[in-house]
């Protein structure tokens, strides 16, 4: 199966768009507090709805159809399901390899509400504060290190997402655009997770922004590696395997990352409303476009 330069270029652009949305999260970190981020609950729920719907209603069925071009129905379904759960396993292993204290998807105290204060050096008096004041003495070097390791953790997570966006965009531009938007929404709070500790530790907006943007660079890198490895061999069977694995990765991301993160910013049932809206809009758009 051959792809034109235009197809590859557009797929890479969509992956770049999805990856560098971490920079948007970085900018939000400079101006917003947690209480101002209720819209993230809707957005993350919406992103999860898009990913779950596409995975089960479009990508996995497409993979099974392609498998059936090479195997009988029984073996095609078994192979498709094996690749689907293989995608989940890959995501799970990546998640387990990252320590909890730097994993951006593990719950931790919201840094935006902390009053940052360096630990006193030897011979210095501790800082004074009034009873009841919420003051956290935080070693700014440790805080900065947390932000950097979080950036590395997010980069590892984003690598397979970049591959998923790129391959989907090559085969079906409509699906690729939907996935790119969903991944971009998902990356915004990840940019926050990187930017907040670095910004609070250093007071340097530029440095916090750069680290957030670089953490998203893994997505186009994942697309580039996928292109180098798979493009020479892409056919129905390769796409079938890729799509089934991608469906598993996207379902894991939705259930393990997006929905829990959406609940963090939730008020009432915002995350649920976003989830339903994402599914409904995706279903309607695919139907109208004849997918």
UniProtKB/Swiss-Prot annotation:
Transmembrane segments: 8-28, 39-59, 74-94, 147-167, 174-194, 209-229, 233-253, 271-291
Record-listed Zn(2+) binding positions: 161, 186, 190
UniProt-annotated location(s): Cell inner membrane
Membrane topology: Multi-pass membrane protein
Name of the featured protein: Zinc transporter ZupT
Keywords: Cell inner membrane, Cell membrane, Ion transport, Iron, Membrane, Metal-binding, Transmembrane, Transmembrane helix, Transport, Zinc, Zinc transport
GO cellular component, one term: plasma membrane
Keyword Cell membrane on entry: yes
Main location: membrane
Domain of life according to the entry: Bacteria
GO MF terms, alphabetically ordered: metal ion binding; zinc ion transmembrane transporter activity
Keyword hit for Aminoacyl-tRNA synthetase: no
Biological role stated in the UniProt entry: Mediates zinc uptake. May also transport other divalent cations.
Catalyses which reaction(s): Zn(2+)(in) = Zn(2+)(out)
Protein family membership: Belongs to the ZIP transporter (TC 2.A.5) family. ZupT subfamily.
Residues that, per the record, bind Fe(2+): 158, 161, 187, 190, 219
Gene name, Swiss-Prot/TrEMBL: zupT
């Amino acid at each position: 199966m051959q792809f034109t330069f235009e197809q590859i270029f557009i797929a890479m652009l969509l992956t770049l768009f999805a990856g560098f949305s971490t920079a948007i999260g970085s900018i939000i970190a400079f101006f917003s507090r947690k209480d101002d981020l209720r819209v993230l609950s809707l957005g993350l729920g919406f992103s999860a709805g898009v990913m779950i719907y596409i995975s089960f209603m479009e990508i996995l069925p497409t993979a099974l159809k392609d498998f059936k071009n090479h195997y009988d129905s029984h073996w095609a379904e078994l192979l498709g399901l094996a690749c689907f759960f293989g995608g989940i396993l890959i995501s799970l292993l990546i998640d387990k390899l990252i320590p909890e204290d730097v994993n951006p998807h593990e719950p931790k105290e919201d840094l935006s509400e902390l009053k940052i204060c360096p630990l006193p050096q030897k011979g210095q008096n501790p800082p004074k504060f009034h009873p009841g004041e919420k003051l956290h003495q935080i070693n700014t070097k440790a805080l900065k290190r947390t932000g950097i390791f979080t950036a590395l953790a997010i980069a590892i997570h984003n690598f397979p997402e970049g591959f998923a966006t790129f391959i989907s965009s090559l085969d079906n531009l409509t699906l690729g655009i939907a996935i790119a938007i969903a991944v971009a929404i998902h990356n915004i709070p990840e940019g926050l997770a990187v930017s907040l500790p670095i910004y609070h530790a250093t007071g340097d907006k530029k440095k916090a922004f750069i680290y957030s943007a670089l953490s998203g660079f893994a997505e186009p890198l994942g697309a580039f590696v996928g292109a180098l490895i798979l493009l020479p061999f892409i056919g129905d069977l390769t796409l079938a395997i890729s799509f089934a694995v991608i469906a598993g990765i996207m379902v894991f991301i939705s259930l393990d990352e997006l929905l829990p993160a959406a609940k963090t910013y939730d008020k009432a049932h915002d995350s649920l409303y976003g989830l339903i809206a994402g599914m409904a809009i995706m279903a309607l758009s695919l139907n109208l476009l004849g997918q």
